[in-house]
Amino acid sequence: MCIRDRWEAETTPADFAHYVHFIIEQLGSELHYICTINEANMGIQVAAIAERYKRQMMAQMQAAQSGGNSADGSVQVGINLQKMMEGQKAAAAENLEVFGVEKVENFTSMRTREGDLLILKAHELAKKEIKALYPDIKVGLTLSLHDIQPQEDGMERAKKEWDEEFMHYLPYIKDDDFLGVQNYTRSLIGADGQLPNPDGAELTQMNYEFYPEALEHVLRKVAKDFHGDLYVTENGIATADDTRRVAFIDTALKGIVSCINDGLPVKSYFHWSLLDNFEWQKGYSMTFGLIAVDRSTQTRHPKESLSFLGHWNQ
C-alpha cells in the first residue's frame, strides 16, 4: 500500500478486503467479534486540527512559550501536532529515500474527503468478506467521538462537528452488528469552532479536560441514530494521580449503568489502558494504565485503580 498512494488510493478498499479474506480464512473459526478498522474517523479529525493549527501556529507557539495550551488536547490521541508540523520536511526526505514518495499516507495521516470515503468502502468490503466466510461473526468498526457541547451561538457549528465526527458515517455502518465508541472528554463548540478549555478546568496529561460524564452523553447521542449494539472500546485518563483515575472510572461506569437502565444496548466497557503504554508521539510520558511499568526492568506495578475497576459495583 505504501507504493500505491497508500490510504488515499482507489485500490485500497480492494487491497484491504483481500487482506481481510486471508486473515479470516486462517483465524475466522476462532473469532466471534471483529472490528475492521479502529477509529475510522481519526484521519479526518487530524486534518481538521492540523488546518486549525496552521492558522493559529504563531499564536499557539507564543502561548506555549508563555505556559499556555497547545492544540494537542483537541484530538483524543497522543499526537504532538507542533512537532509533527515542524518535522514534515525531514519526514518528506526520509519517505523519499525509503518508499520512493515524499508523503506516505499512513492511517493517521491527514485525510481528504475522498480518502475518508475509501476507508468506509474498505470497511464495507471487509464486512462482506467476513460474512461470506463466517456469517455469525459480529462485525463493526470504532469511532473516536467527543461529547460535542454547543455553547452560545455554537449550535450550527456543533451540528457540523457532529456530522463530521459521526453522522456522515451512519449510512455505511447502520447495518453493522455493533459500533465501538471511543471517548475521553468533551468538546465545547462556539460559532467559530472549538473553544479553549474552561478557566480552572482540571486537565489530564493529554491536555484535555477531565470530564468522565462525556461517555454517557456520547452513548446516548449515538444510540439515537445507530441501533446496533454499543461497545465502549476505549475510555480512560492519562494522569499521574491514580485517585483521579478511580474517580474517572467510577463516574464513567455509573453513566453506563444509567444508559443500560434506560434500555440502551451497551454491551461492554474496555478501559484504556491495562498498562502505561507507548502513546504515539508522546511516548511513555502519558500514563493511562491501570498498571505501571518500570521500563528499565519491565516490572509491573498494579495501581489501586486496577482493583477498583475489577471490583466495581454500583
Regions inferred by a protein language model and the residue ranges of each:
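Non-catalytic scaffold segments within catalytic domains of secreted glycoside hydrolases
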Residues: 1-314
